[in-house]
Swiss-Prot record:
Disulfide bonds: none annotated. This is ESAT-6 secretion machinery protein EssA. The gene is essA. GO terms for cellular component: plasma membrane. The keyword RNA-binding does not apply.
Length: 152
């Protein structure tokens, strides 16, 4: 009942601007464009500042290109073995040969097997199974006792 009253008050007090279900689509479609920028007398809007703005844009592009060059072209180091990988993958002469590497692969069989978590899981499964069996047995016992009392 309290929940119904809260919902009713919410619907009654909801306005179209705050939490209402009415959406004014025309308001969202309007574009606000400043058409009268010429009234501002600053260097941003003068023709004299066009060269300055072009120089700033050019400087930004050069800086972005420098960042891209640093990130992608100069990143390939000796440790990535990029050239070796390309030779192995794309050369026809190395199809019969295998590539040698000093990096050892991950071998799961040599990993140390830990038995303690398995012991804990088996004890937990055993206790859960025992609890379920005990609950079923206790439930049947109480049903049998109540049936005996009702027969007397």
């Amino acid at each position: 009942m309290l929940m119904n009253s809260v919902i009713a008050l919410t619907f009654l007090t909801a306005s179209s601007n705050n939490g209402g279900l009415n959406i004014d689509v025309q308001q969202e479609e309007e574009k606000r464009i400043n058409n009268d920028l010429n009234q501002y007398d600053t260097t941003l809007f003068n023709k004299d500042s066009k060269a300055v703005n072009d120089a700033i844009v050019k400087q930004k592009k050069e800086r972005q290109q420098q960042i891209k060059n640093d990130m992608f072209q100069n990143q390939a180091s000796h440790s990535t073995r990029l050239n070796e990988t390309k030779k192995v993958l794309f050369s026809k002469s190395n199809l019969e040969k295998t590539s040698e590497s000093d990096k050892s692969p991950y071998i799961q069989n040599k990993q140390e097997k830990k038995i303690f978590p398995y012991i804990l899981m088996s004890v937990g499964a055993f206790l859960t199974l025992g609890f379920v069996i005990f609950s079923i047995h206790k439930g049947r016992r109480t049903k049998n006792e109540s049936a005996r009392k009702s027969n007397i």
